[in-house]
C-alpha cells in the first residue's frame, strides 16, 4: 500500500472523528445511506447551537421520523447508535461485509432521550491493530471503521502514520547510516511490532 495513500486515509480518519469540526448533517445522511439505505430518509439530524460544550445528544420521534440533535457530528452519530442499539436492537459491526439488520418499521421513541458524554476524549485502537488485517484493507473496510468509530463516539483514533519518518530522522541525527536505519524498517504488517520491539 502506498504510504502517501495511508497517510491521507488516516488524516481523513482523524478529521472525521474530531468533535469540534462542524460541516453539518449531510455526512450523517450519507452514513445512514451506507448502513441501512431503506431507512436512511427516516432520520433527521440537527446540530444544537447553544453554548454548552459537553458532547451530548437528544433523541425524539417527530412526525413519523427519528430526530437526533447533537452538539457536533460525533454526538449525532453516537445518538444514532444509541437509537439503533436500544430501540432497533441491532448492531453495527466494524466489518464492512456485515449488513445492519433493521426492523421493518422503525420503533418510535415514547419520550425524548437526553444523554451527555461521560468523558471529553474517547480513544480507540492500539499499535497492534495496525498489524493484523489493516494493511490489506480496501476503502470499504476503512469507511466502515470510520462509521463505526463515529457511531461509538470515538474522538481520538490512534494514527501511527509517519512514525517511520520520525524514527529515520532521529536515528540518522544520532549517527546511524541510511542503510542501518532502513534495514530496521519492515512491511506494514509488522510495523506495530517494530514500534515496541515485542510481538503483539
Language model feature labels by segment:
Residues 14-23:
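Bacterial Sec-dependent signal peptides at the C-terminal "C-region" and cleavage site
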Residues 55-59:
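Exposed beta-strand-loop-beta-strand "reactive/processing" segments of non-cytosolic proteins
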Residues 26-31, 37-39, 48-52, 62-192:
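Feature activates predominantly on carbohydrate-active enzymes
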Residues 190-200:
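Single conserved hydrophobic/aromatic residue that forms the stacking wall/gate
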Residues 5-14:
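Sec-dependent N-terminal signal peptides
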Amino acid at each position: 500500500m502506498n504510504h502517501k495513500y495511508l497517510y491521507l486515509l488516516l488524516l481523513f480518519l482523524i478529521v472525521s472523528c474530531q468533535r469540534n469540526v462542524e460541516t453539518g448533517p449531510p455526512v450523517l445522511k450519507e452514513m445512514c445511506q451506507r448502513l441501512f439505505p431503506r431507512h436512511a430518509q427516516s432520520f433527521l439530524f440537527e446540530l444544537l447551537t447553544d453554548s454548552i460544550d459537553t458532547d451530548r445528544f437528544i433523541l425524539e420521534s417527530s412526525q413519523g421520523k427519528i430526530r437526533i440533535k447533537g452538539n457536533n457530528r460525533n454526538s449525532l452519530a453516537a445518538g444514532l447508535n444509541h437509537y439503533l442499539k436500544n430501540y432497533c436492537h441491532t448492531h453495527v459491526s466494524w466489518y464492512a461485509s456485515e449488513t445492519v439488520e433493521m426492523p421493518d418499521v422503525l420503533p418510535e421513541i415514547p419520550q425524548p432521550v437526553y444523554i451527555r458524554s461521560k468523558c471529553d476524549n474517547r480513544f480507540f485502537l492500539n499499535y497492534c491493530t495496525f498489524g493484523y488485517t489493516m494493511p490489506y484493507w480496501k476503502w470499504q473496510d476503512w469507511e466502515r471503521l470510520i462509521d463505526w468509530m463515529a457511531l461509538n463516539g470515538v474522538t481520538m483514533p490512534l494514527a501511527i502514520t509517519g512514525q517511520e519518518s520520525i524514527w529515520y530522522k532521529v536515528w540518522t541525527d544520532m549517527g546511524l547510516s541510511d542503510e542501518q536505519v532502513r534495514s530496521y524498517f519492515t512491511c506494514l504488517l509488522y510495523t506495530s511490532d517494530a514500534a515496541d520491539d515485542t510481538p503483539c
